[in-house]
């Protein structure tokens, strides 16, 4: 089922709803005319089964669309993206640490995504912790890589469920739809290779809560079911119905576009793919209740007209118009030909627009062709006017002409990032603005000694370092020798000055050089 079919449901509903609430009814099959007496006239009961003699009514339960059912069934889901966050640190020779964060992707498994989603919904504190980047570790002259595998959950991500084939439709899916959710496969691929979509509830059937049980009266003839009177009192015929599954539930699509699930013994053909069903909303229920009241009122008007005919013993074309069948189905048609009251078996169909039965001037279309008139008289009070136009004495009340107003969803789903084609990631580093990480799985890898240089540079640096170290040792040894040498010389000279005595020329002993010097200066 193409996704566009759901978008055109509101457009298809209006003509189908006219089938349920016709502005007029006219025979599509008209039997031979036969004269009758005035006492054979009778008013049709549009609320009582007159379908092929099925007059046996019995109570039964059936399933119909829930009131408020809308064309697009919303399925809440979430997307799960596998993200690997890598923190790479390098500590150089002087202890300066540089940290680089990188992101990569991996395709997650559905089980892991389901567990991550449950973490988020349960408010597990580990979820808050997992939102942070991995804590980078570091070692001197080494490169340390710390990685964390995270499952990124973004919710809600709302998809539309097609009730006809249970396929899902959303712009986050590559082709706009997903038909792969089964018991064994519980996810859909998305526009992102490393992101999958999953429903919040693993049982997708629970999202299709569109049915309700109702009570009505089954109309049957022997073992054959002809139709039923619904919970609101309106008869619905099974003639022309076809089998149609909604959300996997087998039911019948009736000619008026409604859908019911009920037990029947008759063999029914499957509906063609283009057969859709009417929406069931509060407005349709309200109008259906008003239709029942209107049909009761019309029956009272018919009985009043019939009583007038019986009392006055006279029949007019205007009075015969009250005896027309007001809903699709089997009934009678009446007319007056050459002052003779005539009756014919008829099967009535609904009229959507007046152009269907009056396509041109003077033509009353019945059974696909212009019906002949007798001296300007057709049937059911329809005549040919003096100007050649077909005149229909009455039409259904304005109540039955109003258009059906469909309920619109009051829930506006949040736009998921993947629904915008511009957010389809081409590079791994574009995921930073997209992700919220979950379920950390931290791994640490410590490399060997790394100086941050190529291989030849490492050897040059080691050689230079060794040479500098040798030169430093030699320099220190040289400095130590120079510091020790002046101290030893001074100590030896001091000792000599104290012990050596000098004899002067006069024969006196001079104890030191200073005394000798002072003595010499005295002599001078």
Curated annotation (Swiss-Prot):
Segments in the Virion surface topological domain: 20-459
Membrane protein topology class: Single-pass type I membrane protein
Signal peptide: 1-19
UniProt keyword ATP-binding, yes or no: no
One Gene Ontology biological process: fusion of virus membrane with host endosome membrane
Transmembrane recorded as keyword: yes
Gene Ontology CC annotations of this record: membrane; viral envelope; viral membrane; virion membrane
Cellular localisation: Virion membrane
Cystine pairs: 43-302, 54-226, 80-113, 178-188, 208-247, 242-271, 363-370
Biased composition (Basic and acidic residues): 487-498
Biotechnology: Primary surface antigen capable of inducing and reacting with virus-neutralizing antibodies. Almost all human and veterinary vaccines are based on the functional aspects of the G protein.
Positions of glycan attachment: 56, 177, 338
InterPro entries (alphabetical): PH_Rhabdo_glycop, Rhabdo_glycop_CD, Rhabdo_glycop_FD
Intravirion face residues: 481-524
Keywords: Disulfide bond, Glycoprotein, Lipoprotein, Membrane, Palmitate, Signal, Transmembrane, Transmembrane helix, Viral envelope protein, Virion
Spans annotated as Disordered: 487-509
Pfam families associated with the record: PH_Rhabdo_glycop (PF24834), Rhabdo_glycop_CD (PF24833), Rhabdo_glycop_FD (PF00974)
Membrane-spanning segments: 460-480
Quaternary structure note: Homotrimer. Interacts with matrix protein. Interacts with host TRFC. Interacts with host BST2; this interaction inhibits viral budding by tethering new virions to the cell surface. Interacts with ITGB1. Interacts with host GRM2.
Note: Its mutation dramatically attenuates the virus.
Family label: Belongs to the lyssavirus glycoprotein family.
Protein name: Glycoprotein
Species in which this protein is naturally found: Rabies virus (isolate Human/Algeria/1991)
Top-level taxonomy: Viruses, Riboviria, Orthornavirae, Negarnaviricota, Haploviricotina
Gene this protein is translated from: G
